[in-house]
Amino acid sequence: DKNIASEVLKEEGIPSVYHACFMAPSMLQYTGGKGSWKALLAELEKGTLVCKDNYGTGGNLVFKVRTQAELEQAASDIYKSSEAMAVCRYEDIQSEYRLVVLDGEIRLAFSKIRPSLTGDGVSTVGKLLAEAIAKGQIHSFLVPNEAELSKVPSKGETYLLNWKHNLGQGASALTLSIPDLEEELVSLVKKTAKA
């Protein structure tokens, strides 16, 4: 439950991306709510949002939302299979880490590397992508929208194929050496595990 996890982290003073919960219209009779659209639109006015299934995993039913139409489509898709939608502010996160803690000790650490292409200053995203797919370097389900395919990234420019860091959405895991982890990260993870 993304919202409950956010509430616990907030209560413990642990920094995180806060996830608010918006119940499906079919659940309003149980929550005594008066609807969510006014609050959702107010949040959208502040900037880009991420809407996701409050109970979901793997990057499924996760949408970056910039407009009211995108918000309505995201909510419609999420509420088809979930009673609750988690909404958070979009953050341009460059690096995401996962650490597994057991009995108070970190047992596994890895970072998630999003799929990307490297520009040569001449080839379009479409051509670079076709070459990477042919070589088995990129999954074919990561094709960007048509407008993006004609872009020509500069030489050496990294072109990300997905804004999500999920392994099920094409990212790969890079195992990290536990003794080499930054102390700030280790401290934060141990505090979070205790929460």
Show which residues each predicted segment covers.
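Hydrophobic (often cysteine-bearing) scaffold residues that line and stabilize catalytic clefts
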Residues: 181, 185
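Amphipathic alpha-helical regulatory segments at dimerization interfaces
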Residues: 43, 77, 191-192
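A conserved acidic, glycine/proline-rich C-terminal tail/linker
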Residues: 186-195
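Phosphate-binding site of ATP-dependent enzymes
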Residues: 63-168, 172, 180
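ATP-grasp fold ATP-binding core
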Residues: 9, 36-62, 82-96
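Conserved N-proximal alpha/beta basic substrate-recognition cap immediately N-terminal to
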Residues: 1-39, 57
